[in-house]
Amino acid sequence: MYDTYIFDLDGTLLSTLNDLAASCNYALANNGMPQRTLDEVRQFVGNGVKKLMERAIPNGLNNPLFDKTYQDFRQHYMKHNLDTTCPYDGVMEMLKELHKHGKKVAVVSNKFYAATQELCQHFFGKELVPVAIGEREDIRKKPAPDTVIEALRQLNTTAEGAVYIGDSDVDIDTARNSGMPCISVLWGFRDKDFLLQHGATTLVEKPEKILKVKK
């Protein structure tokens, strides 16, 4: 086993797609814009919620209603991010095993900071996930290594003996930029072929398989 496990959040630990799509479509409808399908939203996520809305809103950042629509999304999502969101099957058991073995664990997400903190505290608590880093104005988001470096600093450890776990190409690039291996999960927002095309080397089909991957 590794010494330190850094996890992505959406599509890796938590199934968040339905709540993200609901808030996205609420904001779009509120501003007279066409709705997006669940599959479209699945493709839009991974680079933070601002990028999600940039992709969902017609003409993106050039739309004069972009800022209002984005704020409508944020406000709705903070009220509704627990409506259907839940850990994937096997995630809680896997995190408890890591805790039992004395492993260091953090979450590093491109989800905005307040939502990352709220969701991690609600579902996992400080015992299972003592460090949770979300998107903030003062630090570059993934795939830049900055948020991973900050998580390692808060865990009082280094990239040596650490592994990054995620469900997307952004996570593969983040791991590479952070100088650590990546475990790609197959239950998230991207499929196996997509992950392999983007450089995935270690793939797992269930959370408990993460525990079996050796350094």
Residue ranges and their predicted role:
Residues 1-3, 39, 113, 117-215:
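Asp-based, Mg2+/Mn2+-dependent phosphohydrolase catalytic module
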Residues 1-43, 54:
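Active-site neighborhood of HAD-like aspartate-dependent phosphohydrolases
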Residues 22-26, 51-55, 72, 93, ...:
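Alpha-helical elements of Rossmann-like donor-binding domains used by nucleotide-donor carbohydrate transfer enzymes
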Residues 29-35, 59-64, 100-101, 124-128, ...:
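Short helix-capping segments at alpha-helix termini
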